[in-house]
Amino acid sequence: MVHLTPEEKALVIGLWAKVNVKEYGGEALGRLLVVYPWTQRFFEHFGDLSSASAIMNNPKVKAHGEKVFTSFGDGLKHLEDLKGAFAELSELHCDKLHVDPENFRLLGNVLVCVLARHFGKEFSPEAQAAYQKVVAGVANALAHKYH
């Protein structure tokens, strides 16, 4: 559960309605793989990840990033029960994929950076603070199976 004021919730939902999930999702996952190269081990089957350019232009990275952002957007509809909303993904990432849950926090921070880049001044300090709460809640929900 994420505790947002009505104003914070309005900021989060309002900005998310303007997100280009396909473009921003691919950018966010690509940036994660470039900035934190050890995360690439989970995506070796995606093909060429040999350089920043290769990663950012990799169609499989873009497609999976879109999938990640779609799931995040779905989670915004369940802010009162993020653990329930992400239960299946938590189980998949823990039991089958063995993803270090710290990576969820890293991806959340990259998501915030990507939103800031695209929304500029519209991504106010208040919007950033609200999104930081949400990405922390989502990371916690995704790590739930690990506890």
UniProtKB/Swiss-Prot annotation:
One MF annotation (Gene Ontology) recorded for this entry: oxygen binding
Reported tissue expression: Red blood cells.
InterPro entries noted in UniProt: Globin, Globin-like_sf, Globin/Proto, Hemoglobin_b, Hemoglobin_oxygen_transport
Keyword Transport (UniProt): yes
Domain of life: Eukaryota
GO BP: hydrogen peroxide catabolic process
Signal peptide interval: none
Pfam families named among the record's database cross-references: Globin
Globin domain mapped to chain residues: 3-147
One CC-aspect GO term: haptoglobin-hemoglobin complex
Residues holding heme b: H64, H93
Residue list for modification Phosphoserine: S51
UniProt keyword terms in alphabetical order: Heme, Iron, Metal-binding, Oxygen transport, Phosphoprotein, Transport
Record's keyword annotation contains Transport: yes
Similarity section: Belongs to the globin family.
Subunit structure: Heterotetramer of two delta chains and two alpha chains.
Name of this chain's protein: Hemoglobin subunit delta
Higher taxonomy: Eukaryota, Metazoa, Chordata, Craniata, Vertebrata
